[in-house]
């Protein structure tokens, strides 16, 4: 199907920003120029809007198989398209976990049949994600995983982690690690500090993240594996990764929108939708994380989309599930708090949310002639009020509910097909 995007400000991901038209035919970008004329096809007017490479989320929980009451591949990818994502990498903490080629094929087949955007499976490091026996990496890679991770179940044994990294290096697989020392995090549920003491909740010290991160950096340097650090949250973690990069360690890192914008002060009213791992930290940490993005220490912004049922969250804070539903608010949150305030540019947003995560995962991204037409059109200035009840995701667990944000996804195009288009007749900005 032929399509033309007219008069948008195209940020291609390669340094260029210009008002232009984009001609798409059979899912491929055929031309980028001014005043392109065609006799047939779909015409999208992008006047006053940015036309960007589709966002790539390298940390999504789609929950299927096993936890379909929280999310399915269908609802999760619908949420992704609504948020401007054209590709998501799904974590292996399903039931059964993505720890063998059969489950990989299941996820791929459901995604092919019911998915709205492209889904890249991440395989488990250990069988059953129990941290005991290494998975068959060669079979997982052949089946199509883009990385290995035990997600929120950190490998506590340094010896086992070294063996995993050694095999990972052998098969050229990206290792994604959740850095948490369970002996330090214990039963903590929020950032350890003044506020946790004031409101009587058990704290998670920053050392729980930083000690495990330091260990994994040492092992990555020793083995030469490609290491990616999931959702960092502390100033100390930024410093450790910066130093590791300076020493030539093959390391990349991501940070979430909520850890870039919210502090532990948001937990004051015991809203369980603020409960995530890692926890919301302090203003000093946020400033360090933003600086880490700016200087290249942190490579990507990832949602860690973790949908839960209402029952998972409608309990006392210390009993509530960790996790935030983030696919549908990520762009708006980053645009509102970082771009519109001048902390980062829209070009940098494109790097953090599209170009860099794609590069880390080994896939293509960017707008150029001959490339696949994975595109998002956004209005960076339109405002709206977040309404969790309008989420496509089954997970309504967002700390941004009721917040006025600036920046709206207008259209998401995957391989030349419109997968989401904002209905401006029915969706009004709440006043």
UniProtKB/Swiss-Prot annotation:
Q: Record's Gene3D superfamilies?
A: Metal-dependent hydrolases, Urease, subunit C, domain 1
Q: Which GO terms describe its cellular component?
A: cytoplasm
Query: Which function does this protein serve?
Result: Catalyzes the reversible cyclization of carbamoyl aspartate to dihydroorotate.
Q: Which UniProt keywords apply?
A: Hydrolase, Metal-binding, Pyrimidine biosynthesis, Zinc
Q: Which family does it belong to?
A: Belongs to the metallo-dependent hydrolases superfamily. DHOase family. Class I DHOase subfamily.
> PROSITE patterns annotated for this entry?
DIHYDROOROTASE_2
Task: Give the cofactors, semicolon-separated.
Answer: Zn(2+)
Q: What are the catalytic residues?
A: 304
Coiled coil start-end? none
List the catalytic activities from the record.
(S)-dihydroorotate + H2O = N-carbamoyl-L-aspartate + H(+)
- Residues engaged in binding Zn(2+) 1: 59, 61, 151, 304
- Binding residue positions for Zn(2+) 2: 151, 178, 231
Q: How is the cofactor bound?
A: Binds 2 Zn(2+) ions per subunit.
Residues the record lists as binding substrate? 61-63, 93, 308, 322-323
Q: Provide the gene name from the record.
A: pyrC
Task: Tell me the GO molecular function terms.
Answer: allantoinase activity; dihydroorotase activity; zinc ion binding
- What is this protein's name? Dihydroorotase
EC annotation from Swiss-Prot or TrEMBL: 3.5.2.3
State which pathway it belongs to: Pyrimidine metabolism; UMP biosynthesis via de novo pathway; (S)-dihydroorotate from bicarbonate: step 3/3
A Pfam family:
Amidohydro_1
**Matching HAMAP family:** PyrC_classI_B
The top of its lineage is:
Bacteria, Bacillati, Bacillota, Clostridia, Thermoanaerobacterales
User: A GO biological process this protein is involved in?
Assistant: 'de novo' UMP biosynthetic process
């Amino acid at each position: 199907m032929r399509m033309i995007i007219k008069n948008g400000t195209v940020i291609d991901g390669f340094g260029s920003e210009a008002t232009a038209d984009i001609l798409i035919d059979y899912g491929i970008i055929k031309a980028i120029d001014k005043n392109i004329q065609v006799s047939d096809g779909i015409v999208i007017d992008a006047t006053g809007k940015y036309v960007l490479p589709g966002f790539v989320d390298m940390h999504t929980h789609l929950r299927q198989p096993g936890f379909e009451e929280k999310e399915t591949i269908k609802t999760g990818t619908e949420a992704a398209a609504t948020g401007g994502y054209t590709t998501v990498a799904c974590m292996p903490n399903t039931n059964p976990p993505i720890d063998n080629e059969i489950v990989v094929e299941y996820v791929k087949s459901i995604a092919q049949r019911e998915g709205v955007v492209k889904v890249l499976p991440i395989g488990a490091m250990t069988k059953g994600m129990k941290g005991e026996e290494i998975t068959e990496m060669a079979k997982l890679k052949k089946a199509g995983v883009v990385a290995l991770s035990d997600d929120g179940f950190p490998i506590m044994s340094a010896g086992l982690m070294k063996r995993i990294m050694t095999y990972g290096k052998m098969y050229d697989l990206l290792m994604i690690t959740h850095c948490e020392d369970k002996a330090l995090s214990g039963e903590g549920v929020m950032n350890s500090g003044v506020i946790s003491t004031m409101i009587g909740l058990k704290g998670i010290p920053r050392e729980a993240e930083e000690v495990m991160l330091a260990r994994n950096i040492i092992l990555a340097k020793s083995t030469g594996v490609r290491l990616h650090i999931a959702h960092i949250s502390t100033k100390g973690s930024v410093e450790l990764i910066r130093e590791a990069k300076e020493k030539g360690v093959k390391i990349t890192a991501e940070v979430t929108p909520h850890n870039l914008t919210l502090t532990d002060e948001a937990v004051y009213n015991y809203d369980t939708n603020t409960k995530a791992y890692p926890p919301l930290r302090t203003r000093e940490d946020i400033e360090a994380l933003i600086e880490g993005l700016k200087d290249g220490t942190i490579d990507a912004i990832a949602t860690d989309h973790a949908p839960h049922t209402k029952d998972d969250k409608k309990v006392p804070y210390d009993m509530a599930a960790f996790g935030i539903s983030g696919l549908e608010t990520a762009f708006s949150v980053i645009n509102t708090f970082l771009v519109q305030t001048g902390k980062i540019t829209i070009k940098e947003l494109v790097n953090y949310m599209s170009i860099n995560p794609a590069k880390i995962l080994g896939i293509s991204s960017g707008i150029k002639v001959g490339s696949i037409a994975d595109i998002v059109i956004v209005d960076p200035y339109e405002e709206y009020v977040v309404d969790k009840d309008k989420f496509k995701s089954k997970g309504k667990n967002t700390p941004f509910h009721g917040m006025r944000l600036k920046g709206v996804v207008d259209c998401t195009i995957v391989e030349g097909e419109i997968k989401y288009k904002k209905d401006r007749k029915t969706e009004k900005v709440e006043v």
